[in-house]
C-alpha cells in the first residue's frame, strides 16, 4: 500500500494518501487541539469545516499558518505544531471565541466537561482580553433537549451529525458572518420540528449550547418525599459507561452502581435487563406470529418486522416515514414495559397506590425522556415511568452524595424485577436486540436447543449488517442498522417493496445505546465505544442464563400475572400503537 512520509515536530510519520495533519499527528502521539474537528471513522461521522482555526500549524515553505484539519499530508512535508507563533495564534483565536461567549462557567451545566473550557485551561488563557457583541440569548427546550444558542461557537458538529449522519435535518446554520446562528427551520421550537430527540447533537457539542433537559431536581424531590416509594431501573448500556466519570472507563460497574443507587435513597433497585427479557418474549412472539403467517402465503402481513426498543428510531418513523408504522413491532420498549409492570403488578403486590409508586429510569438516552412523557404510556394521567434521567445525570447525583465510587462495595439488584439473562444485557449495543431475539425465537419455533449462542456475524460497528439464520430448514433473513442515515437506506427499500428481510433491528444512535445521547462524552474516542460493547458481551458470557425465555422471573410473571406472550393482558400493558407525527411546516408571516 502506498504511503506518505512527513516530519511532524521532528518525528517521522507514515500515513495513507489523503490523511490530514490532525490524523497524521495523532498516529505518532501528537495531539493537535481542535474544537470543530471530529472524525469517527467506523461510525461514518466526520466534521471538518475548518472554522475554528484552533488547529493551525506551521508548514515549512508556506507563509501562512495552515489549519491542520483541512491540510492533506504530502511527501516530505515538514510540520511544526507548537512554535511560539503557533501558540500565540491559537491563544488569540481562542480569546476571540471567548469574547462572544457568556462568562457562566461556574453555573454552566457542562462545567468540567466543556471542550472550550478545557482548551482555555490548556492554552493558558488567564484573562478576557477582548469583549465583543455576544450572540442574542435564545433558549429552546423539549422534554429531551435544551438549546442555548448564546453558548454556540458555530463548530457545526451538530449540523453534520444531524444532517449527514442521522439524515434528520432538524438543525442548520443560517445567516452570514456575525449574524450566523444555528437554528431549526423557520426558527420553530425544536419540539414541533422533525427532530427525533436522538441526542447525537448533544453527544458531539463541545459546549453546553446543546444539552439534555435535566430531571435531577425532580428525582431528588421524590426521594425526599416520605409518602412516596421510589424505584429505579437501569438500562444495560449505563453500567458500561457510568464508570468513565469515575476513572473506570470501558468497564462494567454493575455492582457499584446498584450500591450507589441504594445510598442515594431508592427503595428498590431494579434492572431494565429484566424488561429486556420481557421485550424479547413479546417481540419474539410477535415476529414468529407474523413470520408464520407470511410463510403460509398471507401477504397482508407487514414484513419485515422492525424493532421498537429505540424511541429515537420510533420517532424517526412517525415523523419521517409514518406510512411504515405498521412494520414496527407493537411491543413497547424495555423502559416502558418495566414501568407498566412496576405500576400494574409490583405496586399492587406491595399494597402501594400507583400514584405513590414513583418509577425512575436511568438511561443512556435523552429520547427516553420524551418517550416517558408520551400520554399513552400511563393510566388516568399517572405515567408508567415518572422520571427518566441519563447516565450523565446519575453521575452528577453520585457526586452530590459525596461517594467515592471506586471504593463502593458491590451489590445485586432487587428481586423480582432485577433478575435477567445475558440476552437482556446485550440490548445495549448494536445487534444485541436481534441476537437476543434469535436465541429465543429459534428455540420456541423449532423446539430445539440453539446450536450456538454467540452470533458474531451480527456484531461489530459496520453501519448495516445482515445474516440468514437457519430456523431448522426455514431461512430467516435479518438485518441490523445503527445510525438513522443507515436506517433511512433500509426504510426506503421497504417503502419501494425491495426489502429481502424478515426482521430488522434499528438503533438511532451510531453504535447503539453504548453511544446514546445521554452517555458520558466520548470526545471522538471510538476505542472507548468498542470497550463498552466488549464489556456488555463479557457480562453476557458470564451470565448463568443467556436466553430470555429461561429467566425464572419472566416465567413467574407470565404464570402469576400476564398469562402468555402477546395474550390479552400482555397486549393491554406491554404493547402500543404509533401515530403520524410528520410536522407540517408553515412559514411564519
PLM region descriptions:
Residues 53-197, 203, 210-222, 229:
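Fe-S ferredoxin-like electron-transfer domains
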Residues 5-8, 102, 143-145, 185-187, ...:
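A short, structure-level motif marking secondary-structure boundaries and short turns
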Residues 4-5, 12-90, 213-589:
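Iron-sulfur-associated redox domains of electron-transfer enzymes in respiratory
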Amino acid at each position: 500500500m502506498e504511503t506518505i512520509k512527513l516530519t511532524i515536530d521532528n518525528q517521522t510519520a507514515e500515513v495513507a494518501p489523503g490523511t490530514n495533519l490532525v490524523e497524521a499527528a495523532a498516529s505518532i502521539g501528537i495531539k493537535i487541539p481542535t474544537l470543530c474537528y471530529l472524525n469517527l471513522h467506523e461510525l461514518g461521522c466526520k466534521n471538518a469545516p475548518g472554522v475554528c482555526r484552533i488547529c493551525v500549524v506551521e508548514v515549512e515553505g508556506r507563509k501562512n499558518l495552515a489549519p491542520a484539519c483541512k491540510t492533506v499530508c504530502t511527501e516530505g512535508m515538514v510540520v511544526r505544531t507548537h512554535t511560539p507563533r503557533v501558540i500565540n495564534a491559537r491563544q488569540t483565536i481562542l480569546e476571540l471565541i471567548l469574547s462572544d461567549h457568556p462568562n457562566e462557567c461556574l453555573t454552566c451545566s457542562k462545567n468540567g466537561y466543556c471542550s472550550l473550557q478545557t482548551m482555555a485551561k490548556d492554552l493558558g488563557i488567564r484573562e478576557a482580553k477582548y469583549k465583543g457583541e455576544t450572540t442574542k440569548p435564545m433558549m429552546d427546550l423539549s422534554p429531551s433537549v435544551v438549546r442555548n444558542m448564546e453558548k454556540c461557537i458555530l463548530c457545526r458538529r451538530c449540523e453534520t451529525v444531524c444532517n449527514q449522519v442521522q439524515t434528520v435535518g432538524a438543525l442548520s446554520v443560517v445567516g452570514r458572518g456575525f449574524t450566523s446562528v444555528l437554528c431549526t427551520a423557520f426558527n420553530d421550537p425544536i419540539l414541533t420540528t422533525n427532530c427525533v430527540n436522538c441526542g447525537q447533537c448533544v453527544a458531539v457539542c463541545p459546549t453546553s449550547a446543546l444539552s439534555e433537559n435535566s430531571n435531577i431536581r425532580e428525582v431528588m424531590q421524590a426521594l425526599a418525599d416520605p409518602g412516596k416509594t421510589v424505584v429505579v431501573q437501569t438500562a444495560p448500556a449505563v453500567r458500561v459507561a457510568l464508570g468513565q466519570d469515575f476513572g473506570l472507563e470501558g468497564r462494567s460497574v454493575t455492582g457499584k452502581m446498584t450500591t450507589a443507587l441504594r445510598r442515594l435513597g431508592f427503595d428498590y433497585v431494579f434492572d431494565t435487563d429484566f424488561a429486556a427479557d420481557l421485550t424479547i418474549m413479546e417481540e419474539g412472539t410477535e415476529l414468529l406470529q407474523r413470520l408464520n403467517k407470511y410463510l403460509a402465503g398471507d401477504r397482508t402481513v407487514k414484513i419485515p418486522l422492525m424493532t421498537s426498543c429505540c424511541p429515537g428510531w420510533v420517532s424517526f418513523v412517525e415523523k419521517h416515514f409514518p406510512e411504515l408504522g405498521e412494520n414496527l413491532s407493537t411491543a413497547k420498549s424495555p423502559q416502558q414495559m418495566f414501568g407498566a409492570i412496576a405500576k400494574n403488578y409490583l405496586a399492587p403486590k406491595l399494597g402501594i397506590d400507583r400514584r405513590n409508586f414513583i418509577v425512575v429510569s436511568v438511561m443512556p438516552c435523552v429520547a427516553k425522556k420524551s418517550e416517558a412523557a408520551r400520554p399513552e404510556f400511563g393510566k388516568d394521567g399517572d405515567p408508567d415511568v415518572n422520571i427518566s434521567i441519563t447516565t450523565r445525570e446519575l453521575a452528577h447525583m453520585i457526586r452530590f452524595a459525596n461517594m467515592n465510587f471506586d471504593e463502593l462495595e458491590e451489590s445485586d439488584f432487587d428481586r423480582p424485577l432485577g433478575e435477567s439473562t445475558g440476552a437482556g444485557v446485550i440490548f445495549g449495543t448494536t445487534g444485541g436486540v436481534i441476537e437476543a431475539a434469535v436465541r429465543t425465537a429459534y428455540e420456541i419455533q423449532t423446539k430445539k436447543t440453539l446450536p450456538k449462542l454467540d452470533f458474531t456475524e451480527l456484531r461489530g460497528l459496520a453501519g448495516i449488517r445482515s445474516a440468514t439464520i437457519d430456523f431448522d430448514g426455514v431461512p430467516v433473513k435479518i438485518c441490523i442498522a445503527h445510525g438513522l442515515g443507515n436506517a433511512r437506506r433500509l426504510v426506503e427499500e421497504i417503502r419501494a417493496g425491495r426489502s429481502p428481510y424478515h426482521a430488522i433491528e434499528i438503533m438511532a444512535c451510531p453504535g447503539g445505546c453504548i453511544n446514546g445521547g445521554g452517555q458520558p462524552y466520548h470526545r471522538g474516542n471510538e476505542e472507548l465505544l468498542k470497550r463498552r460493547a466488549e464489556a456488555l458481551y463479557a457480562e453476557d458470557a458470564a451470565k448463568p442464563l443467556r436466553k430470555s425465555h429461561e429467566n425464572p422471573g419472566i416465567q413467574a410473571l407470565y404464570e402469576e400475572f400476564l398469562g402468555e406472550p402477546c395474550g390479552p393482558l400482555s397486549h393491554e400493558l406491554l404493547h402500543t400503537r404509533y401515530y403520524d407525527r410528520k410536522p407540517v411546516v408553515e412559514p411564519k408571516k
